[in-house]
């Protein structure tokens, strides 16, 4: 049935991202947000959160993990280039994104272009402003934030797979930050745990990541993150131990963390 349905669909010739039209919407929203009269309306900020989230999603909206790669011919068109990486994964290069394929399934992707910088910051600001002006907008704002959170959560997962831990950390922290909105009762601690885990991996080459990892893992612990194998304490130990030369107390904390876990 799927094959028959696909046979009726004409493959796209290339990935189409109408960035000009999207930028026009963003620019219109910028003008409205800067207008004293219009910016006093909650609806302006709801729309602002929406159009900026749409811009965030657009380049990768046709992608999901485990998607049959054959469908990409119909949703994204013919890649401009194909190759194989050092792990034997097929790479499909599109104008806006590089797709990793394994066993004819989409395994991950790396977005190589953005429609506009600073989308995340505007989404956070617009959502908060809409609710500040009218709490009744929560019903409209929540689906928008849910979409953005899902985007960053998925970005974190596929970036971990590639692996591109720097991007993964940033994505997981942004997902957690979006959940700090008053719309949600609590941030899902897994986002801080995953960010801390990735930071612990990177700490050997850049000690700042040990510092960041400690911060993220502490937040996960404060939010009652738990797992049966005690991985939080394992990675927190490495973050403390990696900072042992900066402060002797970190060595003590490292030992205490092992005992606690």
Name the predicted role of every residue range.
Residues 16-34:
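Short N-terminal segments immediately surrounding and downstream of signal-peptide cleavage
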Residues 130, 175, 220, 260-261:
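Canonical positions in the second alpha-helix
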Residues 34, 135-136, 180-181, 221, ...:
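Helix-capping and short linker residues that terminate individual alpha-solenoid repeat units
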Residues 1-22:
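Bacterial Sec-dependent N-terminal signal peptides
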């Amino acid at each position: 049935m799927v094959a028959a349905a696909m046979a009726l669909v004409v493959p796209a010739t290339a990935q189409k991202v109408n960035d000009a039209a999207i930028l026009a919407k963003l620019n219109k929203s910028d003008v409205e947000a800067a207008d004293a009269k219009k910016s006093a309306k909650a609806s302006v900020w709801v729309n602002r959160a929406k159009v900026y989230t749409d811009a965030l999603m657009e380049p990768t909206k046709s992608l999901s993990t485990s998607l049959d790669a054959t469908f990409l011919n119909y949703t994204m068109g013919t890649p401009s280039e194909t190759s194989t990486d050092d792990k034997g994964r097929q790479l499909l290069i599109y104008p806006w994104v590089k797709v990793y394929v394994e066993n004819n399934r989409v395994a991950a992707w790396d977005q190589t272009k953005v429609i506009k910088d600073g989308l995340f910051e505007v989404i956070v600001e617009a959502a908060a402003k809409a609710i500040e002006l009218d709490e009744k907008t929560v019903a409209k704002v929540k689906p928008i934030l849910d979409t953005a959170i899902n985007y960053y959560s998925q970005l974190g997962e596929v970036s971990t797979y590639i692996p591109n831990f720097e991007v993964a950390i940033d994505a997981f922290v942004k997902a957690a930050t979006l959940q700090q909105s008053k719309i949600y009762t609590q941030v899902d601690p897994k986002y801080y745990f995953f960010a801390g885990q990735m930071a612990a991996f990177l700490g050997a080459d850049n000690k700042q990541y040990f510092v960041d990892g400690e911060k993220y893992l502490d937040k996960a612990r404060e939010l009652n993150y738990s797992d049966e194998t005690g991985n939080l304490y394992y990675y927190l130990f490495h973050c403390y131990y990696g900072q042992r030369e900066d402060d002797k107390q970190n060595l003590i904390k490292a030992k205490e963390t092992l005992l606690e876990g």
